[in-house]
Amino acid sequence: LFIADREKAYQEKMKNEEDWTCFYTLNIHGGEAQFAFAVPYKAVKMKKAGKKLVLTVKYDYNKPDLSHMEEGEEKKAALKAWKEEKDYEVFDELPFWANGQGIVNKKRTRLAVYDMESGSCEIVTPDYENVESSWVEGDDTILYVSSLYTDKKDVYQGLKQYTVSTGELETLVEQKDMSIDYACILKGKVTFFGSYMKEYGFNENDKLYTVEDGKVELLSDYDDSVHNSICCDCKFADGVSAVHDEDKIYFIATLRKQSVIRTFDA
């Protein structure tokens, strides 16, 4: 299953400012790709959760939601008004621009769940919440790090858990005093890299924590980097800096002049 842009009908919709993403299937033994389905959002990533797909979508609050409007005068009027105002931008948030992303004012990354049996697709994260990282645990659980703001973005992040089968959204770590990098479930317990940023400030290295019943506990007072910071503007590849199985986290660390792979056993 992959994302592509080959359907003329949807190409026309996207030319008219509608957000659609088309998905195709390709037999691993050969043959042509076949159109599978389309969702009325701008999806950029997908992860499988049982018989459903967890989609990372780009959502623009500046635009009218044309993809969900019925064809008619209301939709035509909304499109006309949007096109007439495209020669200027209103900045009413901080930050309104980001390096490598361009204008980010009123733009968020959100999560949607697509049901491959019914064909329904629904955004499952709150309005104006920006999802910064997400992980699918098993067939039914999504962990994600987010920042909720409507005027000025906070330096702190929260950790949430969404249960696909029930639609329940639970806040595990409040967005009030931590920076969070990576989260997973190890041996049945939510475990994450994070920092209170009290010793060295914003770029302070992470420590390893667990959270249960709203209580955050230090698991390891680790003080080295949990990322590969040995790089330059010209490099061959990039990818995730941490992965996990049921028992351990495997991550890249920077030690002086070299990067190494380390593990944590929860």
Feature map (PLM): residue ranges:
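Blade-terminus and WD-like Trp-Asp/Gly-His loop motifs, strongest in beta-propeller folds
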Residues: L1, K45-K52, S134-T141, A183-K189, ...
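A flexible loop/linker signature enriched in serine peptidases of the S9 family
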Residues: A4-C22, A38-K42, V57-R110, T125-V131, ...
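Short loop/turn segments that connect beta-strands within beta-propeller blades
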Residues: N27-G31, D115-G119, T163-G167, E212-G214, ...
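A short, compositionally biased micro-patch
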Residues: I28-H29, V39, E137, T254
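Alpha-helix capping at helix-to-loop junctions
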Residues: H29-A33, Y59-N62
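A structural signal for short, well-ordered beta-strand segments and their strand-loop junctions
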Residues: K47, V54-T56, I123
